[in-house]
């Protein structure tokens, strides 16, 4: 029985990169493998997978290398390294690696597993200089909304979260848009493609185009990228008669951001961050003109949620001036305020007194900055 190193690990070795995941495949049945390796443990529920010395192993798809290669997602992942170091591959794999081309491994690659649509988009975000083969878009456009809708939310979310941390996160959504696959998981952003972000003197792009631009500016901070994706989501609910203005889009965006996070079954912090970005980004952009009480409440809320860094990064990217240069000194001032001992343990009175003192401190800071 031959055991092969397969998939992304082989690809990364050929690209001169250190593999982060190691998957193995063997050319026999599960029964044969377990007989040869009794210490292995079966762990797969829907597929035949077992753990052997901490490594995932499974039978070759279709029983042969050739059938395994065409059953994979992309040609660049359709490779295997045997126990003596011989390389086996999809006929187009090496050339596609050389050409930096993302190509489906077969004409049915995406219909065989529709999650591969999102995997392709994630690779595109990870490698912004790689091209996408025309066949990939042909297969994407042939997908139906129902084929994508039945996917487990966790699998879609996993690919998106990896893309948010990639060098060009917006490309994940651009590829999905180009292939007609934003719906149903990113329904709001499909609609955002056709809505102006605002008056021409401020925004030349659509709502989606504006959000994607900010996402790439914020690359390197995955939470800030997520918040950029959500911040203008409320604009899709603007009355067409009011366009290109979007009065009140902040409040409209909160339930939409929460619904998106729920649909993808994301951790609660993403729901809170998306809602915060939608509701408060306009205030953040006007931070220097806000009254002391409004500034205090905004700073306090963002800080209490543990989202100061990504939120103020978003505010800087979305504003014509670096508002964080005002926000962080203000945050230092209010967090340094200490409630006098006689005001301790008085419930709401204590909270009101602390807020009052923080507002006074912010007003004093503004006078000092203006002097």
Task: Specify the residue positions occupied by each region the protein language model found.
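Catalytic cores of the polymerase beta-like nucleotidyltransferase superfamily
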Residues: 1-371
